[in-house]
């Protein structure tokens, strides 16, 4: 498996004839809500040209919550902003509902942007206007009649749970309430796509969960396609259906969240997800050696379960097949997208099986098992 594109669709990227061929080979592309084809973005400055994005081939399906992650400067914001043409690609195409938005004139761009909502980290509310007025403003600018505006604002404030705050000013609101106003404002034109740029980064963990719950509800009730970028891996884990990992403007990994988070392939993915992974307890790391120091040395195994779809991994069967005394030093099992993802650090003492047979037995029940070392 190569270092890049482990879970990517093999997309051709040239003319209309090849697009038709792709649609036949990959019918899911016909259903893609947003599609990037060989997308590139280069910025030109005093220091010369800087490539922010290159060779991006990606399809986002209608109604899914799609996450974009990567280190700082990986190209996340540049990519998401090409969807509503706040960024003009240097090469390649962006298709929405199979229509190339690169060919849109100014009038069509205005119409496009009304169909794509966007929320930000810092809310961007007008401090001198009430909650009601902040939500109403885009409708007013668009020339929507007053009675229709009132109906829509009432509906949206109820959706985001702020119907009792309609007369409040931003300074009187908490961070979570401000973001709810931002979400309501982003929905005024009944968008089909909602872009979220670090929408929870300024919020505390409890408020973050409430905003994620609201986004999940909006996705389910309204059928919105949600595309979000964040540096908080737990946000991706908790809400997204699929995720793409960017590094230096290139896609290095993509797939269902349970798959990428449960068994990351690329080194960048592993680094980004490291805070969510279990580490070896310090007291055991200090006692660890690469080779057994005596015949009865205990072996330390790092065991990963990925994508178990029923009740979860059969730990009793695993412990029985390993033999000897099995001690769980650290570990846990969580569910992502109704699949069990487990990570266990096991100490096995007195097993009758030699190392290679032990690994073979373990791998029959868990997809990834590694020897961390020996104790004793």
Curated annotation (Swiss-Prot):
Principal EC category: translocase
Keywords attached to this entry: Amino-acid transport, ATP-binding, Cell inner membrane, Cell membrane, Membrane, Nucleotide-binding, Translocase, Transport
Catalysed transformations (reactions): L-methionine(out) + ATP + H2O = L-methionine(in) + ADP + phosphate + H(+); D-methionine(out) + ATP + H2O = D-methionine(in) + ADP + phosphate + H(+)
Main location: membrane
Compartment(s): Cell inner membrane
Bilayer topology annotation: Peripheral membrane protein
Residues binding ATP, per UniProt: 70-77
A molecular function (GO) term: ATP hydrolysis activity
InterPro entries named among the record's database cross-references: AAA+_ATPase (IPR003593), ABC_transporter-like_ATP-bd (IPR003439), ABC_transporter-like_CS (IPR017871), ACT-like_dom_sf (IPR045865), MetN_ABC (IPR041701), MetN_ABC_transporter-like (IPR050086), NIL_domain (IPR018449), P-loop_NTPase (IPR027417)
Enzyme Commission no: 7.4.2.11
Superkingdom: Bacteria
Family: Belongs to the ABC transporter superfamily. Methionine importer (TC 3.A.1.24) family.
Name listed for the protein in its UniProt record: Methionine import ATP-binding protein MetN 1
Gene for this chain: metN1
